[in-house]
Design a protein with these regions (language model features):
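N-terminal leader/targeting segments
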Residues: 1-17
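Structured, beta-strand-rich domain cores
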Residues: 75-141
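Short amphipathic beta-strand/extended segments with alternating polar/hydrophobic composition
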Residues: 43-48, 137-143, 180-185
Length: 207
Protein backbone atom coordinates (compact mmCIF):
# COMPACT_ATOMS: atom_id res chain seq x y z
CA UNK A 1 0.00 0.00 0.00
CA UNK A 2 1.33 3.42 -0.94
CA UNK A 3 2.52 5.51 1.98
CA UNK A 4 0.31 8.46 2.89
CA UNK A 5 2.61 11.50 2.96
CA UNK A 6 -0.08 13.55 4.67
CA UNK A 7 -1.21 11.54 7.71
CA UNK A 8 -3.75 14.19 8.74
CA UNK A 9 -5.64 13.69 5.47
CA UNK A 10 -7.64 10.50 5.01
CA UNK A 11 -7.34 8.77 1.62
CA UNK A 12 -10.60 8.78 -0.31
CA UNK A 13 -12.46 5.54 0.28
CA UNK A 14 -15.37 5.16 -2.12
CA UNK A 15 -16.92 2.50 0.08
CA UNK A 16 -17.43 5.15 2.78
CA UNK A 17 -19.99 6.83 0.51
CA UNK A 18 -23.34 5.21 -0.18
CA UNK A 19 -24.08 4.19 -3.75
CA UNK A 20 -27.58 3.82 -5.13
CA UNK A 21 -28.75 0.28 -5.78
CA UNK A 22 -31.88 1.36 -7.67
CA UNK A 23 -33.05 4.37 -9.66
CA UNK A 24 -36.53 5.83 -9.88
CA UNK A 25 -38.38 9.09 -10.41
CA UNK A 26 -37.56 12.26 -12.33
CA UNK A 27 -37.52 15.81 -11.02
CA UNK A 28 -35.67 19.13 -10.91
CA UNK A 29 -35.45 19.55 -14.67
CA UNK A 30 -33.65 22.80 -15.50
CA UNK A 31 -32.22 24.37 -18.62
CA UNK A 32 -29.65 27.09 -19.27
CA UNK A 33 -29.41 28.94 -22.57
CA UNK A 34 -25.97 28.63 -24.16
CA UNK A 35 -24.04 31.23 -26.14
CA UNK A 36 -21.39 30.10 -28.60
CA UNK A 37 -18.11 32.00 -28.49
CA UNK A 38 -14.78 31.81 -30.27
CA UNK A 39 -13.83 28.32 -31.37
CA UNK A 40 -17.30 26.98 -30.60
CA UNK A 41 -16.88 27.30 -26.83
CA UNK A 42 -20.24 27.43 -25.03
CA UNK A 43 -21.01 29.69 -22.10
CA UNK A 44 -24.23 29.37 -20.13
CA UNK A 45 -26.79 31.67 -18.60
CA UNK A 46 -28.52 31.16 -15.27
CA UNK A 47 -30.44 27.85 -15.10
CA UNK A 48 -34.24 28.09 -15.30
CA UNK A 49 -36.65 25.51 -13.92
CA UNK A 50 -38.75 23.45 -16.34
CA UNK A 51 -41.60 22.17 -14.12
CA UNK A 52 -43.99 19.27 -14.60
CA UNK A 53 -41.50 16.50 -15.46
CA UNK A 54 -43.20 13.23 -16.49
CA UNK A 55 -40.49 11.22 -18.25
CA UNK A 56 -37.07 11.60 -19.85
CA UNK A 57 -35.22 9.09 -22.00
CA UNK A 58 -31.83 9.06 -23.72
CA UNK A 59 -30.76 6.79 -26.58
CA UNK A 60 -27.06 6.63 -27.54
CA UNK A 61 -25.99 8.07 -30.90
CA UNK A 62 -22.97 6.61 -32.65
CA UNK A 63 -21.85 3.78 -34.87
CA UNK A 64 -19.83 0.68 -34.16
CA UNK A 65 -17.19 -0.16 -36.76
CA UNK A 66 -15.84 -3.69 -37.01
CA UNK A 67 -12.71 -4.90 -38.78
CA UNK A 68 -12.55 -8.59 -39.63
CA UNK A 69 -9.35 -10.61 -39.87
CA UNK A 70 -8.43 -14.21 -39.16
CA UNK A 71 -12.11 -15.11 -39.66
CA UNK A 72 -13.23 -13.05 -36.66
CA UNK A 73 -13.80 -9.52 -35.43
CA UNK A 74 -10.19 -8.42 -35.13
CA UNK A 75 -10.88 -4.86 -33.99
CA UNK A 76 -14.02 -2.94 -33.06
CA UNK A 77 -14.55 0.68 -32.16
CA UNK A 78 -17.58 2.77 -31.19
CA UNK A 79 -18.07 6.48 -31.83
CA UNK A 80 -19.85 8.48 -29.11
CA UNK A 81 -21.98 11.12 -30.81
CA UNK A 82 -24.06 11.85 -27.74
CA UNK A 83 -27.74 11.03 -27.34
CA UNK A 84 -31.14 11.37 -28.91
CA UNK A 85 -33.66 12.17 -26.22
CA UNK A 86 -37.28 12.90 -25.40
CA UNK A 87 -38.62 14.87 -22.47
CA UNK A 88 -42.31 14.64 -21.59
CA UNK A 89 -43.75 17.31 -19.32
CA UNK A 90 -47.11 18.64 -18.21
CA UNK A 91 -46.88 21.86 -20.22
CA UNK A 92 -44.30 23.84 -22.17
CA UNK A 93 -43.42 26.99 -20.17
CA UNK A 94 -43.93 30.31 -21.95
CA UNK A 95 -40.41 31.42 -21.05
CA UNK A 96 -38.98 28.29 -22.67
CA UNK A 97 -40.98 28.93 -25.84
CA UNK A 98 -39.58 32.44 -26.11
CA UNK A 99 -36.01 31.96 -24.86
CA UNK A 100 -35.28 28.56 -26.42
CA UNK A 101 -37.77 27.68 -29.17
CA UNK A 102 -37.68 31.24 -30.53
CA UNK A 103 -41.39 32.09 -30.49
CA UNK A 104 -42.17 35.82 -30.31
CA UNK A 105 -44.31 37.26 -27.51
CA UNK A 106 -46.08 40.56 -28.14
CA UNK A 107 -45.87 42.36 -24.80
CA UNK A 108 -48.79 44.63 -25.72
CA UNK A 109 -51.35 42.01 -26.72
CA UNK A 110 -49.87 38.99 -24.95
CA UNK A 111 -50.09 36.96 -28.16
CA UNK A 112 -47.42 34.35 -28.91
CA UNK A 113 -46.32 34.03 -32.54
CA UNK A 114 -44.47 31.10 -34.10
CA UNK A 115 -42.54 32.05 -37.23
CA UNK A 116 -40.91 30.03 -39.99
CA UNK A 117 -37.58 31.76 -39.37
CA UNK A 118 -37.25 31.03 -35.66
CA UNK A 119 -34.18 29.00 -34.69
CA UNK A 120 -34.00 27.10 -31.37
CA UNK A 121 -31.17 28.05 -29.01
CA UNK A 122 -28.64 25.55 -27.75
CA UNK A 123 -29.09 24.76 -24.05
CA UNK A 124 -27.61 22.79 -21.20
CA UNK A 125 -30.20 20.40 -19.75
CA UNK A 126 -30.10 19.38 -16.09
CA UNK A 127 -32.22 16.83 -14.25
CA UNK A 128 -32.07 14.19 -11.56
CA UNK A 129 -33.18 10.62 -10.97
CA UNK A 130 -33.89 9.65 -7.39
CA UNK A 131 -32.30 6.63 -5.75
CA UNK A 132 -32.48 4.56 -2.59
CA UNK A 133 -29.58 6.57 -1.11
CA UNK A 134 -29.41 9.93 -2.89
CA UNK A 135 -30.62 11.52 -6.11
CA UNK A 136 -28.16 11.49 -9.01
CA UNK A 137 -27.95 14.83 -10.81
CA UNK A 138 -27.08 15.04 -14.51
CA UNK A 139 -26.18 17.75 -17.01
CA UNK A 140 -26.12 17.54 -20.82
CA UNK A 141 -24.01 20.37 -22.21
CA UNK A 142 -24.91 20.77 -25.88
CA UNK A 143 -28.63 20.20 -26.40
CA UNK A 144 -30.70 21.25 -29.40
CA UNK A 145 -34.47 20.82 -29.13
CA UNK A 146 -36.95 20.26 -31.93
CA UNK A 147 -40.13 22.29 -32.31
CA UNK A 148 -42.81 20.49 -30.25
CA UNK A 149 -46.12 19.27 -31.57
CA UNK A 150 -49.46 19.86 -29.90
CA UNK A 151 -52.61 17.82 -29.39
CA UNK A 152 -55.78 17.69 -27.33
CA UNK A 153 -58.62 15.31 -26.53
CA UNK A 154 -62.23 15.76 -25.56
CA UNK A 155 -63.26 15.39 -21.92
CA UNK A 156 -64.83 12.15 -20.76
CA UNK A 157 -66.09 11.00 -17.37
CA UNK A 158 -62.53 11.30 -16.12
CA UNK A 159 -60.23 14.13 -17.15
CA UNK A 160 -56.78 13.01 -18.25
CA UNK A 161 -54.22 15.82 -18.53
CA UNK A 162 -52.47 16.13 -21.89
CA UNK A 163 -48.68 16.24 -21.86
CA UNK A 164 -46.20 17.75 -24.28
CA UNK A 165 -43.11 15.99 -25.55
CA UNK A 166 -39.84 17.57 -26.61
CA UNK A 167 -37.40 15.73 -28.85
CA UNK A 168 -33.77 16.76 -28.63
CA UNK A 169 -30.22 15.88 -29.57
CA UNK A 170 -27.45 16.06 -26.98
CA UNK A 171 -24.19 16.34 -28.92
CA UNK A 172 -20.60 16.53 -27.64
CA UNK A 173 -19.13 19.99 -27.03
CA UNK A 174 -15.97 21.14 -28.81
CA UNK A 175 -14.10 19.72 -25.81
CA UNK A 176 -15.71 16.32 -26.40
CA UNK A 177 -17.90 16.46 -23.29
CA UNK A 178 -21.40 14.98 -23.60
CA UNK A 179 -22.71 14.58 -20.06
CA UNK A 180 -21.67 14.71 -16.41
CA UNK A 181 -23.40 13.29 -13.33
CA UNK A 182 -22.94 13.35 -9.58
CA UNK A 183 -21.83 10.29 -7.62
CA UNK A 184 -21.67 9.24 -4.01
CA UNK A 185 -18.33 11.07 -3.72
CA UNK A 186 -19.50 14.41 -5.14
CA UNK A 187 -18.75 17.22 -2.70
CA UNK A 188 -21.69 19.04 -1.06
CA UNK A 189 -20.51 22.32 -2.61
CA UNK A 190 -20.88 20.92 -6.13
CA UNK A 191 -24.03 18.90 -5.44
CA UNK A 192 -25.96 21.72 -3.75
CA UNK A 193 -25.07 24.25 -6.48
CA UNK A 194 -25.98 21.96 -9.40
CA UNK A 195 -28.99 24.05 -10.43
CA UNK A 196 -27.53 27.42 -9.51
CA UNK A 197 -24.88 27.42 -12.23
CA UNK A 198 -23.97 24.93 -14.97
CA UNK A 199 -21.18 22.79 -13.53
CA UNK A 200 -17.91 23.20 -15.41
CA UNK A 201 -14.72 21.82 -13.85
CA UNK A 202 -11.50 23.78 -14.12
CA UNK A 203 -9.75 20.84 -15.79
CA UNK A 204 -11.33 19.79 -19.09
CA UNK A 205 -10.53 16.34 -20.51
CA UNK A 206 -8.84 16.05 -23.88
CA UNK A 207 -11.43 15.12 -26.55
Amino acid sequence: MKENKYPMLMPLDIQMFGENKVRFGLKNVHYAVATEGAGGKLTYGTPERYPGAVSLSLEPRGETSEFYADDRVYYATTVNNGYEGTYEAAELPLKFRVDVIGDQLDETTGVLTETANSKPKTIALMFEFDGDVKATRHVLYNVTVSRPGTSGETKTESTEPTTQELSFIAAPTVDGVVKRATTGTTTPEVYDAWYTKVFEPTVVPTP
